[in-house]
From Swiss-Prot:
<keyword id="KW-0949">S-adenosyl-L-methionine</keyword>
<feature type="binding site">
    <location>
        <position position="93"/>
    </location>
    <ligand>
        <name>S-adenosyl-L-methionine</name>
    </ligand>
</feature>
<protein>
    <recommendedName>
        <fullName>Ribosomal RNA small subunit methyltransferase H</fullName>
        <ecNumber>2.1.1.199</ecNumber>
    </recommendedName>
</protein>
<feature type="binding site">
    <location>
        <position position="66"/>
    </location>
    <ligand>
        <name>S-adenosyl-L-methionine</name>
    </ligand>
</feature>
<feature type="compositionally biased region" description="Basic and acidic residues">
    <location>
        <begin position="360"/>
        <end position="372"/>
    </location>
</feature>
<dbReference type="InterPro" id="IPR023397">
    <property type="entry name" value="SAM-dep_MeTrfase_MraW_recog"/>
</dbReference>
<dbReference type="GO" id="GO:0071424">
    <property type="term" value="F:rRNA (cytosine-N4-)-methyltransferase activity"/>
</dbReference>
<feature type="binding site">
    <location>
        <position position="122"/>
    </location>
    <ligand>
        <name>S-adenosyl-L-methionine</name>
    </ligand>
</feature>
<comment type="similarity">
    <text>Belongs to the methyltransferase superfamily. RsmH family.</text>
</comment>
<keyword id="KW-0963">Cytoplasm</keyword>
<feature type="compositionally biased region" description="Basic and acidic residues">
    <location>
        <begin position="381"/>
        <end position="390"/>
    </location>
</feature>
<feature type="region of interest" description="Disordered">
    <location>
        <begin position="282"/>
        <end position="390"/>
    </location>
</feature>
<feature type="compositionally biased region" description="Basic and acidic residues">
    <location>
        <begin position="305"/>
        <end position="316"/>
    </location>
</feature>
<dbReference type="GO" id="GO:0070475">
    <property type="term" value="P:rRNA base methylation"/>
</dbReference>
<feature type="binding site">
    <location>
        <begin position="47"/>
        <end position="49"/>
    </location>
    <ligand>
        <name>S-adenosyl-L-methionine</name>
    </ligand>
</feature>
<dbReference type="InterPro" id="IPR029063">
    <property type="entry name" value="SAM-dependent_MTases_sf"/>
</dbReference>
<keyword id="KW-0698">rRNA processing</keyword>
Length: 390
């Protein structure tokens, strides 16, 4: 059996004990009500967190989602000892429900009947992917400029560098990498590809060193870090997927269910913060002493702001230095936001669970999910209008 803290796979899960604490209340409640607890791990990776969830909570089941076929296969084999309590899914995490439509498995049956007890997301690129030079994620070793999390489909980083206009390159470097020298770098990339198409990472690193002034290279870590991050985010449409999945996974939570997000860069954390704020915002006009009917939010924040790793965790796991954790819990169903495409199936104390109507799972949940997404977007738009007036 793999050690739950390091694993035979060599991966050290970040803030493992705290993640177990955040998931525990909803899983324990489901267990006491004799209902299976289904956890969605939207970023399975090496499976360190999922392995611990399955070990700590005997009644828990996990749907493990990953875009990387090779890593998904390795992790599925390693977790085979959990048998029918684990179900692997090859998909981008914002498409997890569509990927389950034709699935026939006990975990999926439990998801259909009771929804999710928890959704868990450990965002960003995994350390195992960084260690594979042929994937192109690292700027420390020369390799092909690929950067796809799913190598079976989509454009590569080389495709981006060789086909995007100067303006498009400058935009992604500035927006996704917060690169001060986005314009000069974009011009240099376009100039160099006219001599020879981009294909390897070391050539790009050399160009970055040659373009960014020496005084700027002395601060802020490796000078190629921001460019490689921007390319990876663009290649994998990471931020678009994150915006989509937050309201979607929350729409599948049963009462008391929680969604937990671990972010490692400011762009991710800002999106998580914004989306969760929209979900937990009352629709009652400001100034009224109580919430109007059907205006109270269906979710509340579990974490105060974002949680960070403590000193002990940082010493044990260097990757934990930049992590930010946010979590939300479902506290109700407003009349305008009913259980997504479902009818009451079981009630016990304060917890009610739901089962999908007949027809495909995707169709059954579409109406409620679309309403939740729409409500979140309206809250974001309203907040932007208010901020713009101030």
């Amino acid at each position: 059996m793999a050690d739950r803290h390091t694993g035979t796979h060599g991966h050290v899960p970040v803030m493992l004990e705290r993640m177990v604490e955040l998931i525990a209340p909803t899983v324990t409640e489901s267990s006491e009500n004799s209902a299976p607890s289904v956890i969605l791990d939207g970023t399975l990776g090496a499976g360190g967190h999922t392995e611990s969830f399955l070990e700590r909570f005997p009644s828990a089941m996990v749907i493990g989602v990953d875009r990387d076929k090779k890593e998904l296969s390795r992790t599925t084999e390693r977790l085979s000892r959990f048998q029918d309590r684990f179900y692997p899914v090859h998909a981008r995490f914002d498409n997890f429900d569509e990927a389950l439509d034709d699935a026939d498995h006990p975990v999926v049956d439990a998801f259909d009947a009771h929804g999710l007890s928890a959704g868990f997301f450990d965002l960003g690129v995994s350390s195992m992917q960084l260690d594979q030079v042929d994937r192109g994620f690292t700027y420390r070793d020369d390799g092909p400029l690929d950067m796809r999390m799913d190598t079976s489909t989509g454009k590569t980083a080389a495709d981006v560098l060789n086909t995007y206009s100067h303006g498009e390159l400058a935009r992604i470097l500035k927006t996704y990498g917060d690169e001060r020298f986005a314009g000069p770098l974009a011009r240099a990339i376009v100039r160099e590809r006219e001599k020879e198409p981009w294909s390897t990472s070391q050539r790009l690193v050399d160009l970055i060193y040659a373009t960014i002034p020496a005084s700027a290279r002395r601060h802020g870590g490796h000078p190629a870090k921001r460019t490689f991050q921007a390319l990876r985010v663009e290649v994998n449409a990471e931020l678009d997927a994150l915006r989509r999945v937050i309201p979607k996974v929350c729409s599948y939570l049963h009462l008391g269910g929680r969604a937990v997000f671990m972010s490692y860069q400011s762009l991710e954390d800002k999106i998580v913060k914004r989306e969760l704020a929209a979900l937990t915002e009352s629709k009652t006009p400001p100034g009224l002493p109580i919430d109007l009917p059907n205006s109270a939010p269906d979710f509340h924040l579990v974490t105060r702001g974002s949680e960070k790793a403590d000193e002990q965790e940082n010493n044990k796991n260097p990757r934990a230095h930049s992590v930010r954790v946010r979590a939300v819990e479902r506290t109700g169903y407003s009349h305008s936001s009913p259980p997504p495409g479902s009818t009451p199936a079981r009630a016990s104390g304060s917890s009610t669970t739901y089962s999908a109507r007949s027809g495909s799972r995707h169709e059954a949940h579409r109406e409620g999910r679309e309403h939740l997404v729409s409500s979140a977007q309206q809250s974001i738009s309203h907040r932007e209008d208010v901020e713009g007036e101030q």
